[in-house]
């Protein structure tokens, strides 16, 4: 009976230790996931800003070229 109690106690402690290690890994994985999401949102905002910036520059370039052509032809 005494050896059975020792064995059960040993299994209980080993199970508790392995469970705590699994929880630590899980929390570490969740932290990595948050970093990945933040990185994903930042890259999305960065891409959108580039797209908007390029379109604004194209529009400004077209308007500038039209204005220069107008001045060159004295049609303004």
Swiss-Prot record:
An annotated GO BP: defense response to bacterium
UniProt xrefs under InterPro entries: Antimicrobial_frog_2, Frog_antimicrobial_propeptide
Propeptide: 23-37
Protein name stated in the entry: Esculentin-2MT2
Cellular compartments annotated: Secreted
Tissues with expression: Expressed by the skin glands.
Stored Pfam families: Antimicrobial_2, FSAP_sig_propep
Function, as annotated: Antimicrobial peptide. Active against a variety of Gram-negative and Gram-positive bacterial strains. Active against fungi. Shows strong hemolytic activity against human erythrocytes.
Family that this chain belongs to: Belongs to the frog skin active peptide (FSAP) family. Esculentin subfamily.
Organism, as annotated: Amolops mantzorum (Sichuan torrent frog)
GO annotation, cellular component aspect: extracellular region
Disulfide feature: 70-76
Signal peptide (from-to): 1-22
Key words of the record: Amphibian defense peptide, Antibiotic, Antimicrobial, Cleavage on pair of basic residues, Cytolysis, Disulfide bond, Fungicide, Hemolysis, Secreted, Signal
